[in-house]
């Protein structure tokens, strides 16, 4: 008898080497010889896992392909369906009674939902980059409707009946309600051992993966943060071996020392070819980092540990080049690891709302912004594809976004470190009204050397473009001017964990 690993998604049972996916992998520079083609898209490869004493189950969920019913996308009902499959598998005469789950993207998201259902025979999960709140991570991140990827996603689901349309639901239900609450797993009920993999650069999955890891109830949870894109990372031999140690321990009962693995391993990126991978830590952010506020100064366009007198900066909120920028230069090697937050005072001139986009970039000593292709193919073609879009394939720094009228905080889930918004009410701006926004940003793991800088860009448009090739950029409500207030009794600041070294 053997344990079984489940890969749950509506992408088909064994389409991992379908021509459309092979074309994508070729473009990304991934080596096709590393996989057998037996796996489903984004799932575990049976050629590897079966050779090491596991079965792999590739189900078609409700409504997908020949399965009955309608396709429901990321909901608690899907978690219940997944629960029933796990319990059925555990009862088969070839199964040891131990079941694990694995895979990235959809296959990771579904793991949050099934783990919250607590099937008795689920022994361990391994979500490899996946959203954990469909409204906040996909449909309306920052309260700003963004239907480009949902439209593309819906065309990936094939079945004989109906399929859920997330974009249409986003248009019909622009505020968080019971529908969107049903697409948030009950994190506190996730108590099974978990190996969670995340990155700083995934414009679709990064916030949700970190949220899932933070909020899950399990005391046996590990986080590994890598420095590239999920697909090459998932099939990398060293990472397969690492995941196998995890499953061998929890699905086979092997005493292989897995429990001594650092609870957090993170990437420290210099964005110049010398990233440090697998840095061990006791937490994220690591406990030896100090939360620091860098105050915006609209007059000097600087970020400083001390606040200046009150002043303002403004720009055309609808213009492609409209932005306010602020700089912080280091004179000693300085690490920034954890969750940035921007607390910023804003005013709308000529509008009753603002869609605000913020970006935190690393500049080298010559003042040039650094970026890093996240897939093996980093040649001219990929540079061109990612110049103004396909942000999942080219890391250009941390980002955040928020619609000013959706600024109300969710007291149940907000912290000083990571703000969370309720998105259940609209609070428009009155003429001349100045309001404070708290904007959560993608986590970072950056090291800067003497003479290098952080650059904070505050703007009215998403300068990195759509998440994937052919995904349209988010449309905004912006017109008129955005006025940024800094200093005095309206001290705007960037907060992030910092450690200086000699």
Kindly label every feature range from the protein language model.
Residues 239-240, 252-502:
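Glycine/threonine-rich phosphate-binding loop and adjacent beta-strand/alpha-helix elements that clamp
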């Amino acid at each position: 008898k053997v344990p079984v690993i489940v890969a749950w998604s509506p992408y088909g049972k064994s389409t991992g080497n379908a021509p459309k996916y092979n074309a994508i992998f070729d473009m990304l520079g991934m080596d096709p010889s590393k996989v057998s083609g037996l796996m489903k898209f984004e799932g575990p490869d049976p050629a590897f896992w079966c050779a090491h004493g596991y079965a792999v189950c590739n189900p078609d969920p409700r409504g997908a392909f020949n399965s009955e019913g309608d396709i429901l996308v990321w909901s608690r009902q899907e978690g219940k369906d997944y629960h029933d499959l796990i319990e059925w598998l555990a009862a088969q005469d070839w199964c040891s009674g131990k079941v694990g789950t694995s895979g990235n993207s959809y296959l990771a998201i579904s793991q949050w939902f099934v783990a919250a259902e607590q099937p008795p025979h689920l022994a361990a999960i391994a979500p490899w980059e996946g959203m954990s709140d469909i409204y906040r991570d996909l449909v309306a991140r920052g309260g700003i409707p963004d239907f480009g990827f949902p439209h593309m996603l819906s065309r990936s689901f094939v079945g004989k009946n109906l399929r859920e349309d997330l974009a249409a639901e986003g248009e019909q239900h622009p505020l968080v309600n019971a529908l969107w609450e049903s697409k948030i797993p009950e994190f506190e009920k996730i108590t099974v051992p978990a190996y969670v993999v995340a990155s700083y650069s995934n414009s679709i999955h990064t916030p949700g993966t970190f949220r899932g890891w933070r909020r899950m109830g399990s005391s046996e949870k590990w986080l590994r943060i890598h420095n590239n894109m999920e697909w090459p990372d998932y099939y990398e031999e060293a990472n397969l071996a690492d995941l196998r140690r995890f499953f061998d321990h929890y699905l086979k009962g092997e005493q292989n020392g897995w429990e001594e693995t650092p609870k957090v391993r993170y990437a420290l990126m210099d964005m110049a070819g010398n990233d440090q991978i697998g840095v061990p830590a006791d937490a994220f952010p690591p406990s030896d980092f100090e939360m620091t506020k860098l105050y915006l100064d609209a007059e000097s366009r600087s970020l400083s540990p001390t606040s200046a007198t009150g002043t303002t900066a403004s720009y055309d909120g609808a213009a492609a080049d409209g932005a306010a920028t602020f700089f912080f230069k280091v004179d000693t090697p300085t690490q920034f690891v954890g969750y940035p937050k921007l607390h910023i005072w804003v005013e709308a001139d000529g509008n009753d709302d603002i869609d605000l986009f913020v970006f935190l970039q690393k500049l080298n000593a010559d003042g040039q912004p650094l970026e890093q292709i996240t897939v093996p193919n980093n040649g001219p073609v990929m540079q061109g594809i990612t110049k103004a879009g396909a942000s999942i394939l080219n890391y250009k720094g941390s980002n955040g976004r928020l619609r000013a009228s959706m600024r109300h905080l969710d007291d149940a889930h907000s912290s000083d470190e990571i703000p969370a918004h309720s998105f259940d009410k609209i609070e428009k701006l009155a003429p001349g009204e100045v309001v404070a926004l708290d904007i959560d940003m993608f986590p970072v793991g950056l090291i800067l050397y003497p003479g290098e800088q952080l650059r904070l860009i505050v703007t009215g448009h998403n300068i990195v473009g759509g998440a994937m090739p052919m995904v349209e950029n988010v449309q905004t409500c912006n017109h008129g001017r955005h006025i940024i207030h800094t200093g005095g009794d309206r001290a705007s600041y960037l907060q992030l964990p910092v450690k200086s070294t000699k």
